[in-house]
């Protein structure tokens, strides 16, 4: 659902690096997304950063081709599978409810509901919030449906974490309501030698909400 706009501040700050933003089209599997990103990336070793669902794609890239992933940054993301039982059913109902809104009222109407939990409360109904809505509106209902399918079928990466040996940054907003700090603390504990950065005054859309802090963390990570 996110496009190049989510990384625009970092692309400017990292202008000395070859920064590319992967696209997933109508792919409905995180593994297929990871394979496409690997196939379309330049040959050789890569510094892979992923935000939200993209963090899960980054983990899949590392699982599929660990020899190609030189370092990894996981932003505002998760590593667990869909919960069993009632929690999983609630997540399904929530996501399918959003999809129904997108189909009946359009992507922007859906985004206006969904994105209210994505940013720090003080950024609601601000130009930044509108830019998030603009970005989500650029996606199609079919893309949204495909990404829901991918996320509901997500793999539990817990067993993968101890084997990750590349320099890894784990970053989230202190007020991320979608992927909370405790979730990122668990992710950081699972990856030996990884660094945890919690960005103050920041929700889920860290790259857009606190671009300077995120860019600074990425520059430190690239220097490792």
What are these regions (language model features)?
Residues 181, 185-204:
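Catalytic histidine neighborhood in serine/cysteine hydrolases
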Residues 86-87, 104-163:
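Conserved alpha/beta-hydrolase catalytic His-Asp/Glu region
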Residues 50-54, 58:
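Gly/Ala-rich beta-loop-alpha elbow adjacent to hydrolase catalytic centers
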Residues 202-215:
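Catalytic histidine-centered segment of alpha/beta-hydrolase-like enzymes
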Residues 164, 170-172, 176:
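Short beta-strand/loop motif that positions the catalytic acidic residue
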Residues 1, 174-176, 201-203:
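Acidic beta-to-alpha connecting loop that harbors the catalytic carboxylate
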Residues 1-35, 46:
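Conserved HGGG/HGGXW glycine-rich cap/lid loop of the alpha/beta-hydrolase fold
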Residues 63-64, 68-105, 109-112:
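Flexible "cap/lid" loop of the alpha/beta hydrolase fold
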């Amino acid at each position: 659902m996110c496009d190049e706009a989510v990384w625009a501040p970092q692309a400017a700050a990292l202008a000395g690096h070859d920064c590319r933003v992967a696209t997933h089209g109508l792919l409905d599997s995180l593994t297929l997304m990871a394979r496409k990103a690997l196939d379309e990336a330049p040959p050789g070793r890569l510094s892979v950063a992923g935000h939200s669902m993209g963090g899960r794609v980054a983990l899949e890239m590392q699982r599929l081709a660990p020899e190609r992933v030189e370092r990894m940054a996981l932003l505002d993301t998760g590593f667990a599978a869909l919960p069993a039982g009632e929690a999983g059913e609630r997540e399904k109902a929530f996501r399918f409810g959003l999809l129904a809104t997108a189909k009946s009222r359009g992507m922007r109407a859906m985004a206006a509901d969904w994105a209210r939990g994505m940013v720090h409360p003080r950024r609601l109904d601000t130009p930044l919030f509108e830019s998030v809505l603009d970005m989500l509106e650029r996606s199609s209902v079919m893309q949204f449906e495909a990404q829901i399918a991918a996320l509901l079928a997500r793999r539990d990466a817990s067993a993968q974490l101890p084997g990750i040996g590349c320099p890894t940054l784990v970053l989230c907003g202190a007020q991320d309501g979608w992927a909370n700090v405790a979730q990122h603390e668990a992710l950081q504990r699972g990856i030996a030698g990884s660094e945890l950065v919690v960005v103050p005054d920041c929700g889920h859309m860290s790259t857009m909400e606190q671009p300077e802090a995120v860019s600074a963390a990425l520059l430190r990570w690239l220097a490792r």
